[in-house]
């Protein structure tokens, strides 16, 4: 009876793994299409604005990321990756900025001007009226970044499923030495 339950669990795990692999293949195809679309739109923008108008010379001297990648623990110890806007703080970052005791009397520090919470849109580096193809390139790469995080999470789930599959196969071999 235990071997029968183990085989049923093994079958359901194989079906889940195959579904995840199919989803991974689809997301990789979409990611490749988004990246290709982004580079093509960037080439169109360079053609429209001129090769020297869209290039590294127009980048800001001080760049800040617009998005960050956060890894979090999901069920069964799996890591799940998520793309988060840079201005959004994680719950563990909320709180007092200085640790320790404060001196209430005495010399006061002048607060340092902090950068704005929301980073500036990088498209403004190339002028106010940028071509639509440059905005399309930015959107394509942004979608690609989200897809890359989804693919990384899915790949972790597939690796976890494969290790579970191997463990169940070993248990089945121990229960039925002549089978499997």
UniProtKB/Swiss-Prot annotation:
GO terms for biological process: cellular response to increased oxygen levels; intracellular iron ion homeostasis; lysosomal lumen acidification; lysosomal protein catabolic process; vacuolar proton-transporting V-type ATPase complex assembly. Residues 92-122 are annotated as: Disordered. Residues 16-37, 153-176 form a coiled coil. Gene3D superfamilies: 1.10.287.3240. Keywords: Coiled coil, Congenital disorder of glycosylation, Cytoplasmic vesicle, Disease variant, Endoplasmic reticulum, Endosome, Lysosome. The gene is VMA22. Accessory component of the proton-transporting vacuolar (V)-ATPase protein pump involved in intracellular iron homeostasis. In aerobic conditions, required for intracellular iron homeostasis, thus triggering the activity of Fe(2+) prolyl hydroxylase (PHD) enzymes, and leading to HIF1A hydroxylation and subsequent proteasomal degradation. Necessary for endolysosomal acidification and lysosomal degradation. May be involved in Golgi homeostasis. It comes from Homo sapiens (Human). GO terms for cellular component: COPI-coated vesicle; endoplasmic reticulum; endoplasmic reticulum-Golgi intermediate compartment; endosome; lysosome; membrane; vacuolar proton-transporting V-type ATPase complex. PANTHER family: COILED-COIL DOMAIN-CONTAINING PROTEIN 115 (PTHR31996:SF2). Expressed throughout the brain. Transmembrane segments: none annotated. InterPro entries: Vma22/CCDC115. Residues 92-101 have a biased composition (Basic and acidic residues). It holds the Pfam family Vma22_CCDC115. GO terms for molecular function: unfolded protein binding. This is Vacuolar ATPase assembly protein VMA22. It is linked to Congenital disorder of glycosylation 2O: A form of congenital disorder of glycosylation, a genetically heterogeneous group of autosomal recessive, multisystem disorders caused by a defect in glycoprotein biosynthesis and characterized by under-glycosylated serum glycoproteins. Congenital disorders of glycosylation result in a wide variety of clinical features, such as defects in the nervous system development, psychomotor retardation, dysmorphic features, hypotonia, coagulation disorders, and immunodeficiency. It is found in: Endosome; Lysosome; Endoplasmic reticulum-Golgi intermediate compartment; Cytoplasmic vesicle, COPI-coated vesicle. Accessory component of the multisubunit proton-transporting vacuolar (V)-ATPase protein pump.
